[in-house]
Swiss-Prot record:
It is an enzyme of class 2 (transferase). It catalyses: 5,6-dimethylbenzimidazole + nicotinate beta-D-ribonucleotide = alpha-ribazole 5'-phosphate + nicotinate + H(+). The gene is cobT. Belongs to the CobT family. The keyword Zinc does not apply. Its EC number is 2.4.2.21. It comes from Ralstonia nicotianae (strain ATCC BAA-1114 / GMI1000) (Ralstonia solanacearum). Pathway: Nucleoside biosynthesis; alpha-ribazole biosynthesis; alpha-ribazole from 5,6-dimethylbenzimidazole: step 1/2. NCBIfam families: cobT_DBIPRT, PRK00105.1. This is Nicotinate-nucleotide--dimethylbenzimidazole phosphoribosyltransferase.
Amino acid sequence: MHTDISSFDPALAARLRAAVDSKTKPLGALGRLESLAVQIGLIQDTEAPVLIRPAMVVFAADHGVAQAGVSAYPQAVTAQMVLNFIAGGAAVNVFCRQHGFALEIVNAGVAMPLWSLGVPGLIDAPIGAGTRNFAHEPAMTAAERDRAMALGAQRVAAHAELGSNVIALGEMGIGNTASAACLMARLCDLPLAQCVGRGAGLDDAGLARKCAVLEAALAAHADARAPLDALACFGGFEIAAMAGAMLEAARRRMVILVDGFIASAAALVATRVAPEVQRFCVFAHLSDEHGHRALLAALGAEPLLQLSMRLGEGSGAVLAYPLVVSAVAFLREMATFASAGVSEQAPPALDPAA
């Protein structure tokens, strides 16, 4: 996979910051929107960025580790949710319709043979019928990992060829918070307790079981430390596809909207493979999943929203998009002090004794 990602232009960065500062407002008054506007301009290599055909790609896959009881839901829910996505009934469907996203659902490795159902509108490209149980063996082979990453890159390329310059990535996969927690623990060198959470709603006993399974798996695969080795050992086909998608999107200078905990774990892998990917990522929100705050801190990422969400699907990425739209709009359309004839000088302070 190509990782020839171009760098940002420091001269353009200076011009963008000057353009932001010239708007009719006190310096820094638009807060996070100001740095976001500069970031989007740098991604697109222009002082006048434009957002075109935002696209959401949801990758679905099953996880062998779900057999170890690390999720509150049965594995069959993955396929059921794929059918719900196709029917238009999930949260991500609603939000994509609301905010004008093209939505694509990709079977990256669901255990149920969805091809046999003849599901219309599904990109059916499974790497396998779910990963292996990494409590006992690596989740996937290096070849399977590479195929999953290539699948993600192919889907991004397809949307780029349709004109999209904004890509959001979502996922569905029972057991994938277990994969994300192990990737985080291994690649960030953090205690598992800081990384693992309740996922889709484990009770205390279920959480204790999940922690025990994952601790044993990390110990059993102590040699899987390089980013791509860890991805093959602990990842899911959908996580690998998202990592590959992010690498391709950065190569194409697209805005990458990163959703919650699972998507951030994919971003962790992608940025460890190619650190330049980070500059193209807009981290949408702070998830309520336990490990997400520490994962964002490890990535040096500042999320746009904090809504106590923990749904996945890419839902938070779509909800954050209007802020990206507003950042671009003020950069392009807001008057400058010069064009509006407004003084840039603050008035003199009043003498309280007068």
